[in-house]
């Protein structure tokens, strides 16, 4: 039932979303399947070169670090070449680097190729998200972001299962499978996505300067929320929950995978309702609700007395993540308008910063203080994000059919009025 519900969520809202959203969702699925196949074997493959855990961690960090460093340049590249070209180029860069990584003859070769892959990943992420936000009307941005998120989630659920089979064949097989899925994803994007028109989709919205975007309370709240989500998901949940399951709950490590899989299924099912809530009720309440529930649920993790309650808490966090994956993205599109490459790049960087710093701080707090302190830091950051979301101007309720507010001003008028509040 879980996978059936997830599939229904992923293919819902056919009447209101343009073709670009479906293509990007398919691309996201292909990328996530390959990534899910590779991630479990990457540390083991790195260890096969006779290196220690620090060097293994560097292979993981190199990808994230190069994503962070190269993200600021992606907005500039998009302005010159278009989202479609940069997205496909980025995907092919990751495909080539991943395939070559599978035949690496030394640790340094593997490290360098993963760094190159991080550059391609940044190009794909920023360009795909920019294209997603600028291809839809404001009234369906939440649902579009939810569909895109669901593509990643379903792929992420499927990938590890395929990866287990491939890893039994060879440690290098997942690298080639990942490269293959990326080639498919890049080709799909090039063939099925339309060339960018001369005029942006939303002609009523004027091009907004990046300085104006940064000063907008909605963008500030979205960026802090993305930072908190990167910190909490990667820094706290992914790095400490596996240790907590083994050391505090005294369960086999396999239970971590079961718990994460349950949470991912719940999150996938929740993205559809979260997207509709974001579009009909508003970005502001969705971000406040998501941030608050995420803070409470992540704080409850170290106090879970058994594995079953831990799974429930992680599923609750998955529901919150569904809201935090749709509402902030829609808010960025509302603020930046068309051709929002630089704004999306900075928004993406916030998550990367959280993902890089979060594991270090969480591990330090867990070692020097307690697990409760480590999870508490993530909860506090989530509450800060919710508080900043409270400062956002109250949303106009948008009609999904035409992107106009019900009983209010048009999109262009609404953008102008809310930006000055």
For each feature predicted by the language model, list its residue ranges.
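Conserved MFS/SLC helix-loop-helix module at the cytosolic interface between two early adjacent transmembrane helices
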Residues: 69-105, 278-284
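Cytoplasmic helix-loop-helix junction between adjacent transmembrane helices
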Residues: 113-152
């Amino acid at each position: 039932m879980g996978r059936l519900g997830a599939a229904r969520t992923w293919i819902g809202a056919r009447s209101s979303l343009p073709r670009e959203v479906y293509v990007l969702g398919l691309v996201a699925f292909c990328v996530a399947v390959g990534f899910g196949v590779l991630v479990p074997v990457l540390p083991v493959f790195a260890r096969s070169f006779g290196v220690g855990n620090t060097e293994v961690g560097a292979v993981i960090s190199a990808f994230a670090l190069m994503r962070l460093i190269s993200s600021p340049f992606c907005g500039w590249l998009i302005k010159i070449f278009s989202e479609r070209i940069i997205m496909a180029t980025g995907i092919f860069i990751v495909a080539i680097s991943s395939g070559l990584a599978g035949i690496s003859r030394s640790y340094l070769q593997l490290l360098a190729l993963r760094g190159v892959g991080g550059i391609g990943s940044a190009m794909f992420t920023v360009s795909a998200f920019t294209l997603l936000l600028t291809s839809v009307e404001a009234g369906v941005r939440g649902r579009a972001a939810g569909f895109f998120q669901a593509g990643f989630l379903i792929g992420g659920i499927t990938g590890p299962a395929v990866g287990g089979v491939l890893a039994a064949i060879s440690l290098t097989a997942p690298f080639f499978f990942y490269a293959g899925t990326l080639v498919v994803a890049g080709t799909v994007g090039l063939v099925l996505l339309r060339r960018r028109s001369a005029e942006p989709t939303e002609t009523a919205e004027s091009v907004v300067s990046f300085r104006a975007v940064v000063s907008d309370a909605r963008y500030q709240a979205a960026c802090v929320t993305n930072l908190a989500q990167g910190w909490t998901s990667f820094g706290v949940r992914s790095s400490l929950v596996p240790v907590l399951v083994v050391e505090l709950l005294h369960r086999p490590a396999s239970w971590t995978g079961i718990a994460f899989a349950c949470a991912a299924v719940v999150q996938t099912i929740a993205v559809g309702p979260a997207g509709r809530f974001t579009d009909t009720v508003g970005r502001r309440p969705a971000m406040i609700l998501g941030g608050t529930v995420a803070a409470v649920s992540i704080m409850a993790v170290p106090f879970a007395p058994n594995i079953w309650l831990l799974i429930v808490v992680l599923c609750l966090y998955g529901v919150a993540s569904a809201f935090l994956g749709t509402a902030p993205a829609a808010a960025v599109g509302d603020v930046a308008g068309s051709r929002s490459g630089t704004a999306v790049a900075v928004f993406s960087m916030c998550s990367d910063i959280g993902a890089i710093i979060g594991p270090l701080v969480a591990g330090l707090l867990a070692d020097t203080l307690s697990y409760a302190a480590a999870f508490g830091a993530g909860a506090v950051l989530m509450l800060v994000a919710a508080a900043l979301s409270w400062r956002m101007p109250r949303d106009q309720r948008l009609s999904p059919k035409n992107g106009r507010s019900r009983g209010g001003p048009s999109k262009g008028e609404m953008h102008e009025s809310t930006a000055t509040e």
